[in-house]
Amino acid sequence: MTGAGVADLNDKTVLVTGAAGAIGKAVVAAVRKAGGKAIASDLKGRPGIDVALDVTSEADWQRAVAAIDRLDGLVNAAGIAAVANIEKTDFATWRRVLSINLDGTFLGCKYAFALLRKQGGAIVNLSSVLGLVGGPNLAAYTASKGGVSLLTKSVALYGARFKPPVRCNAVCPAFVEGPMVDEIASGTKDPGTVKNKLALDVPLGRLGAPEEVAALCAYLLSDASAFITGADVPIDGGLTAR
């Protein structure tokens, strides 16, 4: 067993988007701890980045993939949230959230696939429990993550045709400690109370940790999960068990 749990990623190369964010950064660390090579990508100028990549840019994806000789895994971790119900969500915000969360995931799957199918591989898309059950005050975010989950299933079914296959799964966290939760809370009158309420709503009584999500991603990238594809995997402290 490695430091990343049951994951063994020796000799595997994994591209991680959103690598400057809390979850993306933790995924990069988990891949490296499990023996793999992580290529950290995010917007130009972000810290700890190997490759500058705007996930909404088709040209950026083409350029990034062209520079990689071998790819065994992809983690689409880039994402943003916008706190607003359907009446308060303006169209520009809607387009921006879907562009990063859903279009970015689509482009990643599309352009990385040719490299992955050469020897088989795994894609992990960051969805959310709010893509499974919805949320009244995150209209654009829930729509984007619901799209990510169904895109994942389509890619998984296509990837299963290849021998060896290209697996594709979605990780669905509840609220996780980090800038995104801080941003959601900051849009309210009492951020501290809101964060505490988010934690109390979880049966296990706390928010998730980026490292916990990253460990699950590492497992889904590894050969230990070879019979798992097309799945929405909640990591939510029991939130969706209700």
Task: Set out the residue ranges of the language-model regions.
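Short, small/polar-rich loop/turn modules that mediate ligand/substrate recognition or access, typified
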Residues: 160-167, 228-230
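Active-site helix of classical SDR
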Residues: 109, 144, 152
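Short C-terminal tail/terminal secondary-structure segment
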Residues: 2-5, 133, 218, 229-242
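C-terminal helical subdomain
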Residues: 170, 192-224, 228, 237
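Residue(s) in the substrate-gating loop at a strand-loop-helix junction
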Residues: 128
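Alpha-helical segment proximal to the catalytic Tyr-Lys
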Residues: 114, 157-161, 226
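Substrate-binding pocket helix/loop in short-chain dehydrogenase/reductase
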Residues: 85-86, 93-98, 194, 198
